[in-house]
Swiss-Prot record:
Chain spans, region Basic motif: 239-260
Gene name of the record: CIN5
Region Disordered: start-end pairs: 181-205
UniProt organism field: Saccharomyces cerevisiae (strain ATCC 204508 / S288c) (Baker's yeast)
Descriptive protein name: AP-1-like transcription factor YAP4
Protein role: Transcription activator involved in the regulation of genes expressed in response to environmental changes and metabolic requirements. According to genome-wide promoter binding and gene expression studies it regulates, among others, genes involved in ribosome biogenesis, and protein synthesis. It may also be involved in pleiotropic drug resistance.
SMART domains linked: BRLZ
Length: 295
């Protein structure tokens, strides 16, 4: 059967209209298949121009079935609070935290324009009152002020300990906007940072660290400049690498072996000189004795 369904923008106005068309035939009589069997019968003809359905008319071929009634929930728009676009930007964070629009939580609110339409339920006071209601633009001045106060204070931990607790939200944009150098004072160096770190230690630990920093091991045969850097024969600072340290230790061992060998040679030379002197004296004595025997 041909059924036309007309809707007036609401699912309650389903008005099925039945078109008479015989769907039965006598099964006892055989039906011959001819060329005209494939031609549609006149009752199923096309809709005339004056009877053509408008945009809200749907033509379907189905049995006499009543379509179910569907209630569509209201969809959140840009004007409603708590709307989040695809890019992730929030139009109103305070409305988003204080209200929840869920399609499953709906209540039937009467509408003057038509029957009941399911609308989303607004649930308030879901966030504890202790949390501040700040948006992204109100957070940036607070972060910038805290970073500026860090420059005027040598010990940044004192201001943080005495400052009142204010919870805030940090986004990726505000976190990356502050450079890493802004967390340290402008006049800070690695040496000053190390000294400031030692001031927070106990007295015993501070004394041990100061002794370990002040003590410098000077090996024999090594020279250091005013900055405490190891220098070579030319006065240039030596490279502080593992390979260079191995080379310096090998050269030092070679110098020690050479000095020891030289000392041994000097002792042997002195002994040889004494023996030569004694030998010459003995020769003189032998010659004198020979001369006496001849006389």
């Amino acid at each position: 059967m041909l059924m036309q369904i007309k809707m007036d923008n609401h699912p309650f106005n389903f008005q099925p209209i039945l078109a008479s068309h015989s769907m039965t035939r006598d099964s006892t009589k055989p039906k011959k298949m001819t060329d005209t069997a494939f031609v549609p019968s006149p009752p199923v003809g096309f809709i005339k121009e004056e009877n053509k359905a408008d945009l809200h008319t749907i033509s379907v071929v189905a049995s006499n079935v009543t379509l179910p009634q569907i209630q569509l929930p209201k969809i959140a728009t840009l004007e409603e609070p708590g709307y989040e676009s695809r890019t992730g930007s929030l139009t109103d964070l305070s409305g988003r935290r204080n209200s929840v629009n869920i399609g499953a939580l709906c209540e039937d609110v009467p509408n003057t324009a038509g029957p009941h339409i399911a609308r989303p339920v607004t649930i308030n006071n879901l966030i504890p009152p202790s949390l501040p209601r700040l948006n992204t633009y109100q957070l940036r001045p607070q972060l910038s002020d805290t970073h500026l106060n860090c420059h005027f204070n040598s010990n940044p931990y004192t201001t943080a300990s005495h400052a009142p607790f204010e919870s805030s939200y940090t986004t990726a944009s505000t976190f990356t906007s502050q450079p890493a150098a802004s967390y340290f004072p402008s006049n800070s160096t690695p040496a000053t940072r190390k000294n400031s770190a030692t001031t927070n230690l106990p007295s015993e630990e501070r004394r041990r660290v100061s002794v370990s920093l002040s003590e410098q091991v000077f090996n024999e045969g090594e020279r250091y400049n005013n900055d405490g850097q190891l220098i070579g024969k030319t006065g240039k600072p030596l490279r502080n690498t593992k390979r260079a340290a191995q080379n310096r230790s090998a050269q030092k061992a070679f110098r020690q072996r050479r000095e020891k060998y030289i000392k041994n040679l000097e002792e042997k030379s002195k002994l040889f000189d004494g023996l030569m002197k004694e030998n010459s004296e003995l020769k003189k004595m032998i010659e004198s004795l020979k001369s006496k025997l001849k006389e």
